[in-house]
């Protein structure tokens, strides 16, 4: 997986004219997940529609275990109503990867969205998660990333995260910036993450 080829492919997609007035331009690409066997890249893209400008990122990686397997998902385009078939991660693998990231990065994790995702998945998708599959997904994710942690250490780490002022400040900034997270207190978020941990051990 070469960075130059990835950027070239995304630039080709960005340059495709959909006759909708929206343009996309690749800004840059940086290395991510260097601790993984294959690593990955984060590509920043600028989207423009008349006077509206929006920057977003695309994370690209390979080699991650997906347990039990990828899922088929039909995405409905908000603008045209077109239904697009996609291959997506299982819920169990999404949760496992985010849990491992939160635990391994600890208070240094600057992505408040990781915390929010684990919270909202607990609140809205718990009935769709198979706990046995989740345990296997977490095990394989940790093995792939050469990471291990005991339950009591994970809970202790989450206590440290919950009480860290910098983490709480970043969370406050995030909830003010992102409408859907407005009003969600960090204590409730960490409480739900601990529930995921209790499910795993």
Explain the meaning of each model-derived region.
Residues 1-201:
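Structured mid-to-C-terminal alpha-helical surface segments
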């Amino acid at each position: 997986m070469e960075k130059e080829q990835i950027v070239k492919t995304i630039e080709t997609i960005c340059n495709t004219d959909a006759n909708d007035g929206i343009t996309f331009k690749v800004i840059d690409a940086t290395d991510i997940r260097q601790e993984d066997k294959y690593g990955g890249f984060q590509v920043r893209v600028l989207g423009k529609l008349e006077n509206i400008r929006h920057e977003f990122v695309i994370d690209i990686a390979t080699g991650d275990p997906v347990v039990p397997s990828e899922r088929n998902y039909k995405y409905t385009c908000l603008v045209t109503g077109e239904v697009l078939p996609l291959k997506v991660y299982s819920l169990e693998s999404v949760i496992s990867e985010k849990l491992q990231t939160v635990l391994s990065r600890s208070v240094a994790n600057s992505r408040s969205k990781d915390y929010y995702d684990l919270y909202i998945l607990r609140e809205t998708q718990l009935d769709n998660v198979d706990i046995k599959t989740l345990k296997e997904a977490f095990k394989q994710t940790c093995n792939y990333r050469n990471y291990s942690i005991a339950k009591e250490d994970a809970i202790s780490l989450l206590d440290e995260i919950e009480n860290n002022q910098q983490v709480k400040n970043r969370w406050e900034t995030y909830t003010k910036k992102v409408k859907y997270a407005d009003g969600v207190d960090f204590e409730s978020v960490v409480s739900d993450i601990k529930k995921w941990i209790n499910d795993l051990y």
